[in-house]
Each structure stands twice: as C-alpha cells, then as structure tokens.
C-alpha cells in the first residue's frame, strides 16, 4: 500500500548489521532492540564539526557587515544637487535679482525692490501678459483689443489691436517719475508735474509731498497768517475791553479771530510735520 511505501525507508533491512531482528532505525542511527529499548549505534548528528549532508553544499563563511561589538556607520542624508544655490530671476522693471525658491508654482512673483510683478511662467491658456507704461503687469484675454490700467493714479487706456499706418497721435502718453514713499518706503510712479506736489501712495494710501519745497512754503505762509491773526485778536481784545462789557457781540468777534489764528497755526504745524517722498531720479 501507499502508506507502507512511504514508511519503507524507515524500515531496517535484513542485512543491516546495526539493527536487531525487526527493529526500526531512527534518524540518529539508534535501533530498537528486541526488548523494546533504544540501543545507540552511532553518535548523534552534529556532535563535533561534521560536514552537512551531501545534498546541500556548504555555505561560505564571510565577515558580517557589522560585528557584534561595532557601531553602525554614521547616517549621511542625501542632498539635492541644486540645493546649494537658490533659483533666481531678474526683475523686468528694475533688473534686480528675485529669489523664486518655493514660488515656482506661481505665475508671477513680486520684486522686493520696486514692488512690481514679473512673470515666471507662461500665461494661462487664453490669456496674455501686458505691461502698462506705469510698469503695472496686467493679464487679459488674448482677444482683448483695449484694456485699462487699474491703478488709481494711472487709469491709462492701452490699445492692443493691430497698428494701422497713420499720423502719430498729437498727445503723447504722459511719463512719470518713480518716487520712494516717505511713509512705507515703497516705490510708486508720480505723473502730476504741477506746483501742488502732493501724492498719495498706492501701497499705504497716505499722502506725502514730493520734495520739501511745497510743504515748507505752505508752512511759512500758514504760520505768518496765524501769527498775524493772533496779534490782531490780542489788539482787538485790549482795544474793545470796555466796550465789550456793554455789547456782547464783541466777544463773538474775539472768539472768531482767535479761532482763525488757532486754525492757521495748526495748519502750519501740519505742513511742518508732513512726510516727504524723494524721487528716485532727478527731474528732467
């Protein structure tokens, strides 16, 4: 039977000298004697240093990667090949370098010197970039013919249509001067070349004077006018002191003149404390 065939290698053969009559030979070479006890016939396998069975080749002995008493090698993190230098681009307005590390997912970056935008990627599908003469970067549709600058001090209309041959426009586009704000130290474009040199910064929305001449002139005028009104109020008070006791309207005249003097002196103080914005380049 199949079961007997599977156990047949374990049966002791008649010619085996190491086994008794009908005993079984165990794996260690011991056999069961007639009395049922185990009789050792050979030393157990593995005693001493014997070669492994012939069916398996011996494994080569080599040195381990880390000896039992040795520390592992130090950890050295892998570094990126381009980690030594940050990616930089040049500003399209002031030509200053701009660090774009960590901003590569954006389409535009802002310059830290002139606060203007510079594109680092192509415009989205169906869009295009347009640079206004005031250096404002605009994005519009590819099919747009005319766009308006959104900056409150510019509001320039830009024609993007095809250029038709013809005479030049008699009214050229006004140019301006880049000015450093006296409040927030940001740079903006000033286009109003008049005697009234007050400008509102588009970044902080505060008013400053372009140069010191205009606020100094207004301060002197207001101070002199306030001083004159103060002297007038003093003389009026001393000259009409007796009449004021009979006519109460004189007190109202005193109060009116004194109020005008205080307003003029306060305005002089306002012009004296006004911040001054300086142009980046000289007027030409």
From Swiss-Prot:
The processes (GO biological process) annotated in the record are: cholesterol metabolic process; lysosome localization; phosphatidylinositol dephosphorylation; positive regulation of TORC1 signaling; proton-transporting V-type ATPase complex assembly; response to sterol depletion
State the top-level EC class: hydrolase
Q: Where is the composition biased (Gly residues)?
A: 15-38
Q: Which reaction does it catalyse?
A: a 1,2-diacyl-sn-glycero-3-phospho-(1D-myo-inositol-4,5-bisphosphate) + H2O = a 1,2-diacyl-sn-glycero-3-phospho-(1D-myo-inositol-5-phosphate) + phosphate
Disulphide linkage map = none
Q: Which UniProt keywords apply?
A: Cell membrane, Cytoplasmic vesicle, Endosome, Hydrolase, Lipid metabolism, Lysosome, Membrane, Phosphoprotein, Transmembrane, Transmembrane helix
The keyword Transmembrane helix belongs to this UniProt entry's keyword annotation: yes
Q: Where is this region: Disordered?
A: 1-82
Where does the motif CX5R motif lie? Answer: 140-146
What's its membrane topology? Answer: Multi-pass membrane protein
Q: Where do transmembrane segments lie in this chain?
A: 219-239, 246-266
Instruction: Spell out which residues are annotated as carrying Phosphoserine.
Output: 169
Name the Gene Ontology molecular function terms of this record.
phosphatidylinositol-4,5-bisphosphate 4-phosphatase activity
Name where it's found.
Late endosome membrane; Lysosome membrane; Cell membrane; Cytoplasmic vesicle, Phagosome membrane
- An annotated GO cellular component: lysosomal membrane
Q: What does this protein do?
A: Catalyzes the hydrolysis of phosphatidylinositol-4,5-bisphosphate (PtdIns-4,5-P2) to phosphatidylinositol-4-phosphate (PtdIns-4-P). Does not hydrolyze phosphatidylinositol 3,4,5-trisphosphate, phosphatidylinositol 3,4-bisphosphate, inositol 3,5-bisphosphate, inositol 3,4-bisphosphate, phosphatidylinositol 5-monophosphate, phosphatidylinositol 4-monophosphate and phosphatidylinositol 3-monophosphate. Regulates lysosomal positioning by recruiting JIP4 to lysosomal membranes, thus inducing retrograde transport of lysosomes along microtubules.
The protein, known as:
Type 1 phosphatidylinositol 4,5-bisphosphate 4-phosphatase
Q: Which organism is it from?
A: Mus musculus (Mouse)
């Amino acid at each position: 039977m199949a079961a007997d065939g599977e156990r047949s290698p374990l049966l002791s053969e008649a010619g085996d000298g190491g086994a008794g009559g009908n005993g079984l030979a165990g794996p260690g070479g011991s056999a069961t004697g007639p009395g049922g006890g185990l009789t050792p016939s050979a030393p157990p396998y593995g005693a001493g240093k014997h070669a492994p069975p012939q069916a398996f080749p011996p494994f080569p002995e080599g040195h381990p990667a880390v000896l039992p008493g040795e520390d592992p090698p130090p950890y050295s993190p892998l570094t990126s090949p381009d980690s030594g230098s940050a990616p930089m681009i040049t500003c399209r307005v002031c030509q200053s370098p701009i660090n774009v590390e960590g901003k590569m997912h954006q389409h535009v970056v802002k310059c830290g010197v002139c606060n203007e935008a510079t594109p680092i990627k192509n415009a989205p599908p169906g869009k295009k970039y347009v640079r206004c003469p005031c250096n404002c970067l605009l994005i519009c549709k590819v099919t747009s013919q005319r766009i308006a600058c959104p900056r409150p001090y510019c509001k320039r209309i830009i024609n993007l249509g095809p250029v038709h041959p013809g005479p030049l426009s008699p009214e050229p586009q006004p140019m301006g001067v880049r000015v450093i704000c006296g409040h927030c130290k940001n740079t903006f474009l000033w286009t109003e070349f008049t005697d009234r040199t007050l400008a509102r910064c588009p970044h902080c929305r505060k008013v400053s004077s372009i140069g010191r001449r205009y606020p100094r002139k207004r301060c002197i005028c207001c101070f002199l006018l306030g001083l004159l009104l103060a002297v007038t109020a003093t003389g009026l008070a001393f000259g009409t002191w007796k009449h004021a006791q009979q006519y109460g309207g004189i007190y109202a005249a005193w109060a009116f003149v004194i109020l005008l003097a205080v307003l003029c002196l306060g305005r002089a103080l306002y012009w004296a404390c006004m911040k001054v914005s300086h142009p980046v380049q000289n007027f030409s």
